[in-house]
Amino acid sequence: MPLNVSFTNRNYDLDYDSVQPYFYCDEEENFYQQQQQSELQPPAPSEDIWKKFELLPTPPLSPSRRSGLCSPSYVAVTPFSPRGDNDGGGGSFSTADQLEMVTELLGGDMVNQSFICDPDDETFIKNIIIQDCMWSGFSAAAKLVSEKLASYQAARKDSGSPNPARGHSVCSTSSLYLQDLSAAASECIDPSVVFPYPLNDSSLPKSCTSPDSSAFSPSSDSLLSSTESSPQASPEPLVLHEETPPTTSSDSEEEQEDEEEIDVVSVEKRQAPGKRSESGSPSAGGHIKPPHSPLVLKRCHVSTHQHNYAAPPSTRKDYPAAKRVKLDSVRVLRQISNNRKCTSPRSSDAEENDKRRTHNVLERQRRNELKRSFFALRDQIPELENNEKAPKVVILKKATAYILSIQAEEQKLISEKDLLRKRREQLKHKLEQLRNSCA
């Protein structure tokens, strides 16, 4: 959208806020120039939609003074005007000079640090992407960064005396970290430089901090006091990342940090009271976890040798059926005894599997015994003696008929036996009579 602004007075002194609502960039790709240069706020995928539905705000009634315009960065930018005015930023400007000044404000890297990187600034709050609920994740990330830096600087204050040279490097690194998250990862402090002492040393190592380190976050003292006054607070969260600030602000790594903190708290509860003082000391590794005692698992040999019960049983008369039953029962009892000899503690699943296995073995044994009984009954029937494929129903019917015929024959034989006994008695009595007559 072209700039259509007309001023009656060329030397009219206006503040940036009174003219800002009328300014728009000429080209579409420069609409998010401030966000593209800082790389902290990537351009939204719906730039055209934002421009289409953007309403022109009304100018304020009275010009307000921004903290960014009064900051040293604003004063540092004004002498770099291409016009080379001798005003030095203190006199009246023409319309062209004001336009160039606004362009430099939008494109200057030094001003971007004060306008964009400061979460408390009004420009940061009035940003389009910050106001959108879908793209407001950066606000939470900046809040997390400020909290981490506050705890980081508070821990550095308590750990030792300040060192000016190292404090300057820490300040520069932290400011660069606020400016660019990806660039700060390569400029972090070496842990060996900050903590030159070993882990087992009782004395705390001297760490570097700057005199004005509290300027990074206004809530550093409040965070430190809340951490010390909380009865449930653990000394471990301050020790998690002392040597370097976090290098990412994604949700997945925030969840990982939360899980690690919970893990540290749970481990600290298991430790003895004497070891808690040692766990509170800072270390180069960050996380302090006690060595876990190895679990001693005793294993026992479970007999898995099983016969192939699915194979067709042999009908040969090698040994009697009673001997077969005895051998099978001995084999099953031996398997059960081998399972009971295992003295190691098992879970409920292992016990259930053993019970199921034992039940399956006993069920197979019962079926095999029933099958052998049918085969033995078939061998006793004369009609089915040589028929190995006789069904069980035929075997039962033939066996019933055979039993009835045997019972009828038995009754006949019993009656014959009675007749023969009577005949014998008669013959004995007649023999006695003959002996008496001869005598």
From Swiss-Prot:
Subunit description: Efficient DNA binding requires dimerization with another bHLH protein. Binds DNA as a heterodimer with MAX. Interacts with TAF1C and SPAG9. Interacts with PARP10. Interacts with KDM5A and KDM5B. Interacts (when phosphorylated at Thr-58 and Ser-62) with FBXW7. Interacts with PIM2. Interacts with RIOX1. The heterodimer MYC:MAX interacts with ABI1; the interaction may enhance MYC:MAX transcriptional activity. Interacts with TRIM6. Interacts with NPM1; the binary complex is recruited to the promoter of MYC target genes and enhances their transcription.
Domain topic, free-text comment: The 9aaTAD motif is a transactivation domain present in a large number of yeast and animal transcription factors.
Listed Acidic residues bias regions: 251-263
Motif position, UBR5-degron: 355-364
Gene Ontology, cellular component aspect: cytoplasm; nucleolus; nucleoplasm; nucleus
Name the UniProt record assigns to this protein: Myc proto-oncogene protein
UniProt keyword terms in alphabetical order: Acetylation, Activator, Chromosome, Cytoplasm, DNA-binding, Glycoprotein, Isopeptide bond, Nucleus, Phosphoprotein, Proto-oncogene, Transcription, Transcription regulation, Ubl conjugation
Residue numbers spanned by region Disordered: 206-294, 335-360
Segments of skewed composition (Polar residues): 335-347
Chain positions carrying an annotated carbohydrate: 58
Residue spans of biased composition, Low complexity class: 207-237
Residues in cross-link Glycyl lysine isopeptide (Lys-Gly) (interchain with G-Cter in SUMO2): 52, 143, 148, 298
BP GO terms, sorted: chromatin remodeling; chromosome organization; DNA damage response; G1/S transition of mitotic cell cycle; intracellular iron ion homeostasis; MAPK cascade; negative regulation of apoptotic process; negative regulation of cell division
Gene3D superfamilies in the record: Helix-loop-helix DNA-binding domain
